[in-house]
Amino acid sequence: MIALFGEKLRFFDTTLRDGEQTPGVSLTPDQKCIIATALAAVGVDVIEAGSAAASPGDRAAIRQIANAGLGVEVCTFVRAMTGDIDAAVECGVDSVHLVVPVSDLHIQKKLRKDRATVAAMANKAVDYAKERGLIVELSGEDASRADQSFLAEVFASGVEHGADRLCFCDTVGLMTPERTALMIPPLAAIAPLSIHCHDDLGFGLATTIAALKAGASCAHVTVNGLGERAGNTPLEEVVMALERLYGYDTRIRTERLYPLSVLVSRLTGVPLPAQKPIVGELAFTHESGIHADGILKDPSTYEPLAPETVGRTRRIILGKHSGSASVEAALQESGYRPTPAQLQVIVARVKHLGDQGHRVTDGDLAAIAEAVLEVSTEPVLVLKQFTVVSGSGVLPTASVTLLVNGAEVTNAATGTGPVDAAIEALRRSVADVAAISLLEYHVDAITGGTDALVEVTATLSNGEMTRTSRGAETDIIAASVEAVVQGMNRLLRRRDEDRR
């Protein structure tokens, strides 16, 4: 199967350039450097760190990344303009992604020029960049709508002038795998060719794979598929498709893909869709009784790849679709051992809660189990009071007082907002007995109006296990505190049971 591909496939990551062009995304130089370091650790070959001509901030970021000693090729986007190339040289990059419009639509409508002028601009820019010691990747913008004969001429001439690599840009995502299989081979014969796809019609991944099969040797990608409009081809999806479907060793450290995805989502402020392949919250989550039963017997029954491969863990959640096997497994994980008759009662109550439209959390399951099994437990933590101060020009600050195993503990903390401050104060209050971190936080307004009942779902971890709990109040801070305290209690109680 590896014979489908030619030389070693390369990954050109443009998260910090094309990805940052996602509407509303703006990264600081330090944030860009953090992401670049993570990209290098994952194993991409080229990092397009930004556009040197875009702004002083982008130049500072590119310079910082170029000087970071990451051990990968650092590139910047440039137009066929000497000023752009001078800025690239000033930043100390290894290469330039020299982008030239090649479709008549772009040449005539955007540039107000003709083909001959654009071809000459490309050659002149290649000459200028090579004279300054740069690696040049000559990219045909809107190549999928270009006259392919003209595109081939531009590419061939660019290579004659010293271009090291070429790139076919499907700028608005109009390519299909069938067209790709026909159009890529003659271009790949000219020089090493990259494929750069946008995902406007959902074909980005399929077109990228088709291009690699047809002779392209490098995939342009972004983490989480970030990019303008509908985004670009996602790094994590291309890598795992090649690994899992074609048996190709990408040499990417796949176990770092999910941590990288979470990092980029956090720094860009772009949330991950729950059902996004590979990295979405639900990508390795199961509820259906039939599926969960199969997963418990053999994970490959309902999973295309092991979650650990990409740095994930499997989750089985409970709801109206759950069966006895998944409920029993969840109960056993929490330390409960019901009889068959008790299990059926618990399953019925779980389904009833799901029918009410609720997500059944670990706290819900524990409450149901303890009621059915007639278990009485004393909580490790008891909330006595909390206070939050927040407002315009005021650093959000929270103070909480808890009874921890009967001993009163008071802690204060600041945060990015009142909820963040309250959760941090709670975390500090239990720091002496456990290191607990918040993994996921979700808010829903259950009712309408200004006095709406707010439901908060929080997932916490102590490094060994996770627990999900829920709080419901008209005050979002109170609901958050309730959910976190409940989750902490579940983790601490299970830890104490394991020690016994």
UniProtKB/Swiss-Prot annotation:
Keywords, ordered alphabetically: Amino-acid biosynthesis, Branched-chain amino acid biosynthesis, Isoleucine biosynthesis, Transferase
The task this protein performs is described as: Catalyzes the condensation of pyruvate and acetyl-coenzyme A to form (R)-citramalate.
Q: Which reaction does it catalyse?
A: pyruvate + acetyl-CoA + H2O = (3R)-citramalate + CoA + H(+)
| Enzyme class label | transferase
Q: Report the protein name in the record.
A: Putative (R)-citramalate synthase CimA
UniProt GO molecular function: (R)-citramalate synthase activity; 2-isopropylmalate synthase activity
**What InterPro entries does the record point to?**
2-isopropylmalate_synth_dimer, AIPM/Hcit_synth_CS, Aldolase_TIM, Citramalate_synthase_CimA, LEU1_arch, LeuA/HCS_post-cat, LeuA_allosteric_dom_sf, PYR_CT
Q: In which pathway does it act?
A: Amino-acid biosynthesis; L-isoleucine biosynthesis; 2-oxobutanoate from pyruvate: step 1/3
Q: What HAMAP family would the database entry show?
A: CimA
Q: What is its EC number?
A: 2.3.3.21
Q: How does it assemble?
A: Homodimer.
One of the Pfam families matching this protein, by short name: HCS_D2
Q: What residues does the Pyruvate carboxyltransferase domain cover?
A: 9-258
